[in-house]
Amino acid sequence: MRKSIPEMMSVIPVPAWQTHDWLLHKHYAKRIPSISYAFGLYCSGNGLQGVCTFGKPASPFLCVGICGGDSSALVYELNRLVVNDSCPKNTASYFVSKSLNALPGGLIIVSYADIGMGHIGKVYQSTNWLYTGATKERTDIGVDDNSHSRHYDKGLDYSLNRKLRTSKHRYVYFTGNKKEKRENRKNLNYKVLPYPKGNTRRYDASYNPDIQQTLFT
Protein backbone atom coordinates (compact mmCIF):
# COMPACT_ATOMS: atom_id res chain seq x y z
CA MET A 1 0.00 0.00 0.00
CA ARG A 2 1.31 3.44 -0.94
CA LYS A 3 2.16 5.68 2.00
CA SER A 4 0.24 8.91 2.60
CA ILE A 5 1.92 12.29 2.16
CA PRO A 6 2.34 12.83 5.95
CA GLU A 7 3.95 9.39 6.18
CA MET A 8 6.41 10.16 3.37
CA MET A 9 7.10 13.85 3.90
CA SER A 10 8.30 16.11 6.69
CA VAL A 11 8.51 19.90 6.87
CA ILE A 12 11.54 21.36 8.64
CA PRO A 13 12.79 24.94 9.17
CA VAL A 14 15.90 25.53 7.06
CA PRO A 15 18.46 28.35 6.79
CA ALA A 16 17.70 30.86 4.04
CA TRP A 17 20.80 29.94 2.00
CA GLN A 18 19.44 26.44 1.52
CA THR A 19 16.59 27.83 -0.59
CA HIS A 20 18.75 29.93 -2.93
CA ASP A 21 19.42 27.33 -5.62
CA TRP A 22 15.70 26.58 -5.85
CA LEU A 23 14.66 30.23 -5.96
CA LEU A 24 17.27 31.39 -8.47
CA HIS A 25 16.89 28.52 -10.93
CA LYS A 26 13.59 26.70 -10.39
CA HIS A 27 11.08 29.41 -9.41
CA TYR A 28 9.88 31.57 -12.32
CA ALA A 29 10.82 34.87 -10.59
CA LYS A 30 14.55 33.91 -10.69
CA ARG A 31 15.51 36.09 -7.72
CA ILE A 32 15.84 35.82 -3.96
CA PRO A 33 13.27 37.80 -1.96
CA SER A 34 13.36 38.94 1.64
CA ILE A 35 13.43 35.78 3.78
CA SER A 36 12.50 35.78 7.47
CA TYR A 37 11.30 32.18 7.71
CA ALA A 38 12.21 29.28 5.41
CA PHE A 39 11.01 25.69 5.34
CA GLY A 40 12.16 22.62 3.47
CA LEU A 41 10.00 19.71 2.34
CA TYR A 42 11.85 16.45 2.88
CA CYS A 43 10.89 13.06 1.49
CA SER A 44 12.15 9.97 3.28
CA GLY A 45 15.03 8.58 1.22
CA ASN A 46 14.77 11.27 -1.47
CA GLY A 47 16.09 14.39 0.23
CA LEU A 48 14.83 17.93 -0.22
CA GLN A 49 11.76 18.13 -2.48
CA GLY A 50 10.63 21.73 -2.06
CA VAL A 51 11.11 25.07 -0.32
CA CYS A 52 8.70 27.65 1.07
CA THR A 53 9.77 31.12 2.23
CA PHE A 54 8.18 34.01 4.10
CA GLY A 55 9.51 37.54 4.36
CA LYS A 56 8.58 41.18 4.85
CA PRO A 57 6.77 42.59 1.80
CA ALA A 58 8.72 45.00 -0.38
CA SER A 59 6.08 47.71 0.06
CA PRO A 60 5.50 49.28 3.50
CA PHE A 61 2.18 50.55 2.14
CA LEU A 62 1.06 46.95 1.67
CA CYS A 63 1.88 46.18 5.32
CA VAL A 64 -0.28 49.10 6.46
CA GLY A 65 -3.04 48.40 3.96
CA ILE A 66 -3.86 44.84 5.06
CA CYS A 67 -4.96 45.47 8.66
CA GLY A 68 -3.89 49.04 9.43
CA GLY A 69 -0.76 50.71 10.73
CA ASP A 70 -0.91 49.23 14.23
CA SER A 71 -0.70 45.73 12.73
CA SER A 72 1.84 46.46 9.98
CA ALA A 73 4.74 44.83 11.86
CA LEU A 74 2.79 41.56 11.90
CA VAL A 75 2.50 41.35 8.11
CA TYR A 76 4.66 38.84 6.25
CA GLU A 77 4.42 37.49 2.72
CA LEU A 78 4.56 33.90 1.57
CA ASN A 79 6.80 34.97 -1.28
CA ARG A 80 8.10 31.70 -2.73
CA LEU A 81 6.77 28.16 -2.97
CA VAL A 82 8.54 25.53 -5.08
CA VAL A 83 7.85 21.79 -5.07
CA ASN A 84 9.28 19.14 -7.39
CA ASP A 85 6.78 17.95 -10.01
CA SER A 86 7.50 14.34 -9.08
CA CYS A 87 5.83 14.77 -5.67
CA PRO A 88 2.34 13.27 -5.17
CA LYS A 89 -0.80 15.33 -5.83
CA ASN A 90 -1.71 17.68 -2.96
CA THR A 91 1.89 17.80 -1.69
CA ALA A 92 2.03 21.60 -2.11
CA SER A 93 -1.10 22.05 0.03
CA TYR A 94 0.36 19.82 2.74
CA PHE A 95 3.64 21.76 2.60
CA VAL A 96 1.96 25.17 2.89
CA SER A 97 -0.30 24.01 5.73
CA LYS A 98 2.60 22.62 7.77
CA SER A 99 4.71 25.73 7.11
CA LEU A 100 1.92 28.05 8.26
CA ASN A 101 1.45 26.01 11.43
CA ALA A 102 5.17 26.31 12.16
CA LEU A 103 5.11 30.13 12.06
CA PRO A 104 4.70 32.21 15.24
CA GLY A 105 1.11 32.89 16.25
CA GLY A 106 -0.54 36.23 15.60
CA LEU A 107 1.04 36.93 12.20
CA ILE A 108 -0.79 38.25 9.15
CA ILE A 109 0.33 36.43 6.01
CA VAL A 110 -0.34 37.70 2.51
CA SER A 111 0.42 35.93 -0.74
CA TYR A 112 -0.25 36.46 -4.42
CA ALA A 113 -1.15 34.30 -7.38
CA ASP A 114 0.17 35.88 -10.58
CA ILE A 115 -2.62 36.07 -13.16
CA GLY A 116 -0.03 36.80 -15.84
CA MET A 117 1.55 33.41 -15.14
CA GLY A 118 -1.82 31.67 -15.32
CA HIS A 119 -2.13 31.16 -11.56
CA ILE A 120 -5.36 31.45 -9.56
CA GLY A 121 -4.10 30.35 -6.13
CA LYS A 122 -5.50 26.84 -5.80
CA VAL A 123 -2.99 25.97 -3.08
CA TYR A 124 -4.25 28.92 -1.01
CA GLN A 125 -7.85 27.93 -1.58
CA SER A 126 -7.16 24.37 -0.45
CA THR A 127 -5.50 25.64 2.75
CA ASN A 128 -8.32 28.03 3.70
CA TRP A 129 -6.85 31.44 3.00
CA LEU A 130 -9.16 34.44 2.61
CA TYR A 131 -9.44 35.78 -0.94
CA THR A 132 -9.47 39.59 -1.03
CA GLY A 133 -9.55 40.38 -4.75
CA ALA A 134 -6.94 41.18 -7.38
CA THR A 135 -4.33 43.91 -7.53
CA LYS A 136 -4.31 46.41 -10.38
CA GLU A 137 -2.02 45.94 -13.34
CA ARG A 138 0.80 48.51 -13.34
CA THR A 139 4.32 49.23 -14.52
CA ASP A 140 7.47 49.33 -12.38
CA ILE A 141 10.98 50.57 -12.97
CA GLY A 142 12.90 47.80 -14.70
CA VAL A 143 16.23 46.89 -13.11
CA ASP A 144 18.66 44.97 -15.32
CA ASP A 145 19.83 42.47 -12.70
CA ASN A 146 16.24 41.31 -12.02
CA SER A 147 16.28 42.78 -8.52
CA HIS A 148 13.21 44.48 -7.10
CA SER A 149 12.35 47.96 -8.40
CA ARG A 150 12.89 49.45 -4.91
CA HIS A 151 16.65 48.89 -5.47
CA TYR A 152 16.94 51.20 -8.48
CA ASP A 153 19.52 54.02 -8.71
CA LYS A 154 17.60 57.29 -8.29
CA GLY A 155 20.27 59.11 -10.28
CA LEU A 156 19.53 57.25 -13.52
CA ASP A 157 16.76 57.75 -16.08
CA TYR A 158 14.52 54.67 -16.27
CA SER A 159 11.73 56.25 -18.33
CA LEU A 160 12.35 53.87 -21.26
CA ASN A 161 12.95 50.82 -19.11
CA ARG A 162 9.70 50.01 -17.36
CA LYS A 163 8.28 46.53 -16.79
CA LEU A 164 4.65 45.47 -16.71
CA ARG A 165 3.48 44.09 -13.36
CA THR A 166 0.47 41.95 -14.14
CA SER A 167 -2.60 41.75 -11.92
CA LYS A 168 -2.37 39.25 -9.06
CA HIS A 169 -4.92 37.48 -6.90
CA ARG A 170 -4.39 38.46 -3.25
CA TYR A 171 -4.87 35.98 -0.39
CA VAL A 172 -4.60 36.58 3.38
CA TYR A 173 -4.07 34.10 6.22
CA PHE A 174 -3.91 34.61 9.99
CA THR A 175 -1.66 32.37 12.10
CA GLY A 176 -2.10 31.36 15.71
CA ASN A 177 -4.95 30.30 17.97
CA LYS A 178 -8.61 31.27 17.57
CA LYS A 179 -8.23 34.43 19.65
CA GLU A 180 -5.20 35.65 17.69
CA LYS A 181 -6.89 34.94 14.38
CA ARG A 182 -10.09 36.68 15.48
CA GLU A 183 -8.24 39.81 16.64
CA ASN A 184 -6.43 40.20 13.33
CA ARG A 185 -9.44 39.25 11.21
CA LYS A 186 -11.54 42.07 12.67
CA ASN A 187 -8.92 44.58 11.47
CA LEU A 188 -8.84 43.30 7.88
CA ASN A 189 -9.34 46.24 5.52
CA TYR A 190 -10.32 44.16 2.50
CA LYS A 191 -13.66 42.59 1.73
CA VAL A 192 -13.53 38.78 1.65
CA LEU A 193 -14.67 37.52 -1.76
CA PRO A 194 -15.50 34.11 -3.30
CA TYR A 195 -12.52 32.18 -4.63
CA PRO A 196 -11.72 32.74 -8.32
CA LYS A 197 -12.24 29.79 -10.64
CA GLY A 198 -10.23 28.55 -13.59
CA ASN A 199 -7.37 26.34 -14.65
CA THR A 200 -3.77 26.82 -13.59
CA ARG A 201 -1.11 27.11 -16.29
CA ARG A 202 2.17 25.41 -15.47
CA TYR A 203 5.57 26.98 -16.10
CA ASP A 204 8.88 25.28 -16.83
CA ALA A 205 10.26 24.08 -13.48
CA SER A 206 12.39 21.27 -14.88
CA TYR A 207 15.61 22.48 -13.23
CA ASN A 208 16.92 19.89 -10.77
CA PRO A 209 18.37 21.54 -7.65
CA ASP A 210 20.52 19.79 -5.07
CA ILE A 211 18.10 17.57 -3.15
CA GLN A 212 20.67 15.94 -0.87
CA GLN A 213 21.01 18.97 1.39
CA THR A 214 20.50 18.36 5.08
CA LEU A 215 19.81 20.73 7.92
CA PHE A 216 22.87 21.58 10.00
CA THR A 217 22.12 22.44 13.63
Annotated model-derived regions:
Residues 10-14, 55-163, 173:
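Acyl-donor binding region in acyl/amide transferases
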Residues 23, 36-56:
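Conserved beta-hairpin
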Residues 36-38, 126, 168-170:
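Extracellular structured ligand-interaction cores
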Residues 158-185:
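A conserved mid-domain beta-alpha-beta active-site/ligand-binding segment of alpha/beta enzyme cores
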Residues 1-34:
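Short amphipathic alpha-helix that is part of the acyltransferase structural core
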Residues 183-217:
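Short, cationic low-complexity segments
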